[in-house]
């Protein structure tokens, strides 16, 4: 990865981290794009290279944070060698709940902002190319299962809710 790509990644990461901090302390309504870029140390134009508005960064941030949760749970699942969809799903849910128990701000952010519309957009698309493709991994676990589900998206949303 070249210097330019690293710089872009650093700026986007700063925007994500700052937006998360501001959204969890001030709330979405009281946070402005100017607040985000000022605290992230980037120009306003940089924000608009990556996001349409603060609602767009919120939605992508949900996907990004959920991707981190699922990625860590997936790594732990791989190391555990647990088989069977139900057992694997229980393991992943327990792993995520353990993490959310220690990170109440993340739990609050996701629970406040997760709706069916945001869920469908956020969980079916990766926020970034290097984000963990958790929705696809979830579908892969389902494919390996003997049971067929009519609405795997709804099943996942229900579990998360």
Named regions from a protein language model:
Residues 99, 118-146, 153-157:
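Amphipathic alpha-helical packing segments from all-alpha helical-bundle domains
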Residues 41-51:
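Short hydrophobic/aromatic patch on the recognition helix
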Residues 51, 112-118, 157, 161:
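Short helix-capping/turn signature of helix-turn-helix
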Residues 60, 75-102:
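Hydrophobic alpha-helical connector segments
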